[in-house]
Design a protein with these regions (language model features):
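Generic hydrophobic/packing signal
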Residues: 62, 69-71, 86, 90
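Glycine-rich "substrate-gating" loop/helix at the edge of Rossmann-like oxidoreductase active sites
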Residues: 44-46, 72-77
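Glycine-rich anion/phosphate-binding loops
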Residues: 16-20, 75-88
């Protein structure tokens, strides 16, 4: 039987600092989750306007967990720059 892969998004939005999100990612990696996801959101108190920058911070403190965005608004970006940014993060 195939393995079930389980991912999670942040649950504590009291601080959207890179450190807080990285701490959450390390915690779920230690619990055995497979992936950690951030949304792109430009409005409200929980706005994350640049998830790739925060995921870069998360990648510096994790080693096994996969990282991704639940949404990434390509229509707001130059397609070449967006592709390069994602490639650098990979």
């Amino acid at each position: 039987m195939d393995k079930l892969h389980v991912g999670i998004t942040p649950w504590d939005f009291s601080s959207l600092s890179a450190k807080n999100l990285a701490d959450q990612a390390v915690f779920v990696e230690d619990l055995g989750y497979d992936s950690f996801w951030l949304p792109e959101n430009h409005f409200g108190e929980n706005a994350i306007p640049d998830p790739l920058t925060l995921l870069a911070a998360v990648s510096g403190v994790t080693s096994k967990i996969k990282l991704g965005t639940t949404s990434y608004l390509l229509t707001l970006r130059n397609p070449i720059q967006a592709a390069e940014q994602v490639a650098v993060l990979d």
